[in-house]
């Protein structure tokens, strides 16, 4: 069973419209404050991050504001990380229908993230450069968090009560059996590096190319089975808020999710990011580029999120503390969510484009043209769209059951499914 299917089996997904309607019917819940901090140490100079807190769903309307945070851990150079940092957000937003309400915008976001990742990958590969990058891309709109990721730059969520949740899936071949099976089914090989004498060393890699990852943006010289299709997860926080820790593998190769979360509880986001990096450095030294972004989603009127670790108290002081806490909760009960847990809205990690884009055809009613679900260009389905005489439906593949794709994006889809050979020699 796939990770995404298992998740849907274990959790009851709550329709986004239900949650938003619940907010509207209850007393008005103010938008949370978003506070953040960032820290980094460079070893190769291939880590990049993105912080944008002034984005607007409706240009000129501050009430439609949302925030974006990203980590881009490059390999074989920094060009893919830089390009993705500069273009991914625009490509994602362009895939969301204009004029969408907030409800519609959030519901369209998971699909738009897939289209944006694939479009960014196609555009970068057309530049002919060979570097690649992991991507962890976080969009925060009110209490709703949407995370899309390829690679191993993890994002965790720490909420009240010390519950730490993983919002990403590591696409490391060493740890992800499902991804190993996908690559071999697509014509790639998975194995360790062979050294003199036939001995195998190091982590599992895919060949050709030698990458330890199964998903990334870029990596032009590696097999096309290294796909840019992200794992996407969308959750809604309780009104008590939560803390995100987004970091490159320079952190996660050293610290577990629980250790990282516990190490910085009670600190501001800025100090928390610095402490996480410092803890990783103290444990094993600077082995790789190390970048950490901490984001606190804080209820309106609160200066901080998580309280500092409780000190030992005598029984009488402890009783008073519990009573004050209960009284405060009762006073705020009408303002805060009755459900003090994270509610899962969406999760999907399939590497099959048809699973992620749906089956509807996006049409331009004024011109009768069809819009490519990935790159958003309008084309006529009756024309020969390719530059080399190919048809919309490749003879090398079964009929495409997803939405309309232009020739370039159709070829990319076929390549990702192993229907076109690809050679490479890049190792990282």
Curated annotation (Swiss-Prot):
InterPro entries: PP2C (IPR015655), PPM-type-like_dom_sf (IPR036457), PPM-type_phosphatase-like_dom (IPR001932)
Binding site for Mn(2+) 1: 73-74
Species of origin: Arabidopsis thaliana
Name assigned to this protein: Probable protein phosphatase 2C 5
Keyword annotations of the record: Hydrolase, Magnesium, Manganese, Metal-binding, Protein phosphatase
Catalytic activity, reaction form: O-phospho-L-seryl-[protein] + H2O = L-seryl-[protein] + phosphate; O-phospho-L-threonyl-[protein] + H2O = L-threonyl-[protein] + phosphate
Matching SMART domains: PP2C_SIG (SM00331), PP2Cc (SM00332)
E.C. code: 3.1.3.16
Top-level EC class as recorded in UniProt: hydrolase
GO CC, alphabetical: plasma membrane
Cofactor(s) in the UniProt record: Mg(2+); Mn(2+)
Family: Belongs to the PP2C family.
Coiled coil: none
Matching PANTHER family: PROTEIN PHOSPHATASE (PTHR47992)
Domain PPM-type phosphatase, chain residue ranges per copy: 25-297
Binding sites annotated in the UniProt record for Mn(2+) 2: 73, 249, 288
